[in-house]
Amino acid sequence: MTDAIETRSSHACFGGTVGFFTHQSVETKTPMNFSVFTPPQAKDGKVPGLVYLAGLTCTEETFMIKAGAQQLAAELGLALICPDTSPRGAGIEGEDESWDFGTAAGFYLDATQAPWSTNYRMYSYITQELPALLAAHYPAVDMDRLGVFGHSMGGHGALTIHLKNPDLFKTVSAFAPIAAPMRCPWGNKAFSNYLGPDQESWKAYDASELVASRGTGPAILIDQGLADGFLEQELHPHHFEAACAAAGRDVTVRRHAGYDHGYYFIASFMEDHLRHHATGL
């Protein structure tokens, strides 16, 4: 991992700081962007950190601008870390042709198929390179108290990454996650291209498959809007609920009439998610 990071901008926010950064990634072999909200408590000691994984078409800016999380994070003393959703500018033919695959659609996995396998390594980026970057540049973030949460594709990422790395990310929650990607068009498109035709390999990145062998762990919180246009075809929270029940894993899926898939929905329930993580960390 390269130690150099470039500060693109920095802004005072609720007594803390929001910063936007770029660094050269070893995992993706491209520049990678991320943002960090550092709460005021970080001036006096270590604070827990929450890594937020955004969804399709989003960037490291989306959550910081739209989610409205900073005020409560400042009160609770939580650092917020938001990586980008994929490599950018890898130069792979076809990576910019559709909104649900390639650029801004890295699916938080390590691709095994050419030409994607060289750059599309978001799983290793989130679980290895980003924590090392935080440890090197943000000593106030307590690396023993990290949580992960996300939205849609990022909810899929949060669930799978926590299930596979419970000692790294000790708490988890999700907004409208792609909870059973092997059963939906988004997941099938991504997995078949990034991972190849062998569906056994897909199970390593499907939360509804992973939880069967990882039943123990902290409670999982999921919020889902019932006016979400992607609910029936793409998200399938009921499959994850059933898998958790079979595995004995504590999960709460809250369904909300009238709420859609966007950031008005996320902002409406952000407080509950931040408090969920603050309690667990």
Name each model-derived stretch.
Residues 2-281:
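Non-catalytic cap/lid and distal C-terminal segments of serine-dependent acyl enzymes
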